[in-house]
Amino acid sequence: MRIILLGAPGAGKGTQAQFIMEKYGIPQISTGDMLRAAVKAGSELGLKAKEIMDAGKLVTDELVIALVKERITAEDCRNGFLLDGFPRTIPQADAMKEAGIKVDNVLEFDVPDELIVERIVGRRVHAPSGRVYHVTFNPPRVEGKDDMTGEELTTRKDDQEETVRKRLVEYHQMTAPLIAYYSKEAAAGNTAYHKIDGTRKVTEVSAELATILG
């Protein structure tokens, strides 16, 4: 069960990734975590990555693919894995294919931009505890105050509307070609592509994923 997740920030991808990991016992592979782990372990690939990063350069696709290949041979990937945040570009997707990394399912979480903006911009945080509220979906008992301490709630910088809209534009620019790429791959019988309606309740989305993944 080798899965790629696609979806804008706020589309509910993280919540469903957790569900898939727990239900099917497969790890989520994040390229950022992988790079940090390789550097820390001092492996041959890790040392190469460190050299590039220390020079302030971006790690090459070839190196990331090599790390992914190495990572998926680990024991915890025996039943599959979940790739989040990779591939980001067509050359990366092509490189994965050339490296023989087969993908069984591509899951795209589809939520209209306006709903994503509402979901993210409405978040309020109690910074000391990390408790998160939402002005519409999960409001505090007293507006603008933490339920437990009565302290002031704040908005994270990343949750401000201008930032969210900018991230959405970037997401669509980057992901539209990937959606087309994997739709074509699915039509050729090389993978299965599923567009998931992410506007529904978390439990409904999870139930659909369980049906798709079996």
Curated annotation (Swiss-Prot):
Principal place of residence: cytoplasm
Catalysed transformations (reactions): AMP + ATP = 2 ADP
Gene3D superfamilies for the chain: P-loop containing nucleotide triphosphate hydrolases
Pathway membership: Purine metabolism; AMP biosynthesis via salvage pathway; AMP from ADP: step 1/1
GO BP term, pick one: AMP salvage
UniProt KW keywords: ATP-binding, Cytoplasm, Kinase, Nucleotide biosynthesis, Nucleotide-binding, Transferase
EC number: 2.7.4.3
Region (NMP): 30-59
Database matches in InterPro entries: Adenyl_kin_sub (IPR006259), Adenylat/UMP-CMP_kin (IPR000850), Adenylat_kinase_CS (IPR033690), Adenylate_kinase_lid-dom (IPR007862), P-loop_NTPase (IPR027417)
Location of region: LID: 122-159
GO MF entries: adenylate kinase activity; ATP binding
Binding site for AMP: T31, R36, K57, L58, V59, G85, F86, P87, R88, Q92, R156, R167
GO cellular component: cytoplasm
CDD domains: ADK
Residues annotated as binding ATP: G10, A11, G12, K13, G14, T15, R123, V132, Y133, R200
Subunit structure: Monomer.
Function: Catalyzes the reversible transfer of the terminal phosphate group between ATP and AMP. Plays an important role in cellular energy homeostasis and in adenine nucleotide metabolism.
Domain notes: Consists of three domains, a large central CORE domain and two small peripheral domains, NMPbind and LID, which undergo movements during catalysis. The LID domain closes over the site of phosphoryl transfer upon ATP binding. Assembling and dissambling the active center during each catalytic cycle provides an effective means to prevent ATP hydrolysis.
Record family assignment: Belongs to the adenylate kinase family.
Protein name per UniProt: Adenylate kinase
Source organism: Erwinia tasmaniensis (strain DSM 17950 / CFBP 7177 / CIP 109463 / NCPPB 4357 / Et1/99)
Gene: adk
